[in-house]
Every structure is written in structure tokens, then in C-alpha cells.
């Protein structure tokens, strides 16, 4: 868990700027870059550090975890958008949850600028709190949602799992109300 070196961050930054340039000039869905565009932009730099980062992306670009290397087929402009992560494997679930949470935050900020509230409903909410990164992000957006016209709502049948998260205190403190229905004997 050492993270990226400064030179790796630099080659990624350079590649991201290059692949987003056409999209920013003409922001339509067809111009939205995907992971293979980033992969190619890294290889085009002809630097060992860029090649190393590109090799690390191979699994997600052309390997068995390439599910995110495609244009989206989700119409995010509908009033109701549902994301289902059930089919994501264990390795992609955390990444998928972070992408979805980021998409939802984008919708909240967009709706706020239009004076519209956004209702965010997360079923099986305890799953978001299992992983440290998604739990921290959940707590952060939960706090910000209310200020930005969002109505965050979490539902779970596993209250015990929910309460075991260190982030749950922040979430509960930033909730107007909490409703507990009949619990299984193990969750009482």
C-alpha cells in the first residue's frame, strides 16, 4: 500500500489531460474516454513509468476485469436511476460502489443548481460500510447530502453489521430520523 510515486502520478495526469481534451472540446457521450484510451495514452508516452502503469491496467482493459472498459449503457438522465452491483465480482465491488457513489454525488450537485432535491436510497446499506474506503465516502457524502438538498436513505436487514462500522456514528448523527422495524433475534 505504498501508493503511486510522483513520476507515476505525473504520467497519469498527462495521459488523463490528453484523453479528456477531445471530450472537453465537444462534451458528448461518444467522446467520453474509457480505460483503454487511458491505457493507450500511457503507452504513447514511451516512458518506463508510463508502461508500468499501463501494464497494471491490463487486467481492467483487456483482462477478466474489463467490465468498466466500455461506454455506459445507463441512462443517467432519467428521474429514477437504479444501480445493481450484485453481478460484480468481489474484486470489482468496491470500485463499482465508489463509481456509483461518485455518480450520485454528481447528480446531487447538478440537481442543487436547479433547485431540485435528490433522494438517494441505498438498499443493503451495511455493504457500503464493510469496506473502509466506501464507508468513509458514505459518511462524507451523507453529511454533505443534506446541505446540498439531498435526502440520503439507507436500508438494511443486518443492523448488527451496520452498527459494527466505525463510520455509522457520523451517519446517524447526520440523520433526521431513524426507523427500526422488527429485528431478528440476533440483531436485537
What do these predicted ranges mean?
Residues 95, 177-186:
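Short flexible/disordered coil segments
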Residues 166-181:
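A short helix-turn-beta junction within AAA+ P-loop NTPase domains corresponding to the substrate/partner-engaging
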Residues 1-150, 154, 163-166:
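P-loop NTPase motor domains
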Residues 90, 186-188:
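A short acidic, often aromatic-flanked loop/helix-cap motif at beta-alpha or helix-coil junctions
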Residues 154-159, 182-185:
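A short beta-strand-to-loop transition that corresponds to the Sensor-1 phosphate-sensing loop
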Residues 78, 148-150, 173-177, 187:
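Short glycine-/polar-rich loops that comprise or flank the Walker A/P-loop
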Amino acid at each position: 500500500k505504498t501508493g503511486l510515486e510522483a513520476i507515476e502520478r505525473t504520467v497519469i495526469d498527462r495521459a488523463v489531460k490528453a484523453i479528456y481534451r477531445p471530450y472537453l472540446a465537444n462534451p458528448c457521450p461518444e467522446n467520453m474516454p474509457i480505460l483503454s484510451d487511458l491505457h493507450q495514452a500511457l503507452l504513447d508516452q514511451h516512458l518506463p513509468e508510463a508502461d508500468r502503469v499501463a501494464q497494471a491496467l491490463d487486467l481492467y482493459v483487456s483482462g477478466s476485469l474489463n467490465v468498466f472498459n466500455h461506454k455506459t449503457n445507463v441512462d443517467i438522465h432519467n428521474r429514477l436511476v437504479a444501480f445493481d452491483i450484485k453481478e460484480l465480482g468481489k474484486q470489482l465491488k468496491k470500485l463499482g460502489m465508489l463509481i456509483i457513489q461518485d455518480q450520485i454525488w454528481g447528480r446531487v450537485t447538478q440537481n442543487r443548481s436547479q433547485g431540485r432535491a435528490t433522494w438517494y436510497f441505498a438498499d443493503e446499506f451495511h455493504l457500503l460500510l464493510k469496506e473502509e474506503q466506501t464507508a468513509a465516502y458514505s459518511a462524507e457524502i451523507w453529511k454533505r447530502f443534506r446541505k446540498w438538498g439531498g435526502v440520503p436513505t439507507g436500508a438494511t436487514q443486518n443492523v448488527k453489521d451496520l452498527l459494527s462500522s466505525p463510520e455509522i456514528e457520523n451517519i446517524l448523527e447526520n440523520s433526521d430520523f431513524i426507523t427500526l422495524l422488527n429485528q431478528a433475534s440476533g440483531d436485537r
